[in-house]
Amino acid sequence: MERTASAVWHGGLKDGKGSISTQSTTLKDTQYSFSTRFENGVGTNPEELIAAAHAGCFTMALSAQLTGAGTPPESLETTASVRLEKKDDGFAITAIHLVTKAKVPGADKAAFDKAAADAKAGCPISKLFKGNAEITLDAQLI
């Protein structure tokens, strides 16, 4: 399986702007710029897209873990926060914090915690950042 996305940029870093599109066209000419990345401008940015990808990936992995354990979720809601920091050699993503709230009829806390930890470790986006960014998880069974 292979998925693609493209980015187009015009101009310099601070005064330029660009657009991002995905193969599925869910994102089509979605605007991004220095302002959207560093100053709360209108549009998206790479870190926001990574957060969305990680939240989605982890949530699907958790659903698979719970379903495999015989306790399919009623609902899962995950937020991912990506931290971008300036380092000596440039900017780096240093941490990703996942917060998930789960309604899982029949699941006990210990089994849920194990499923969440396994999902965090097994999610392909988590694997991508392993060793490069601290990934933390707050998993709540509600």
At which residue positions do the language-model features occur?
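Extended beta-strand/beta-hairpin segments
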Residues: 1-52, 59-142
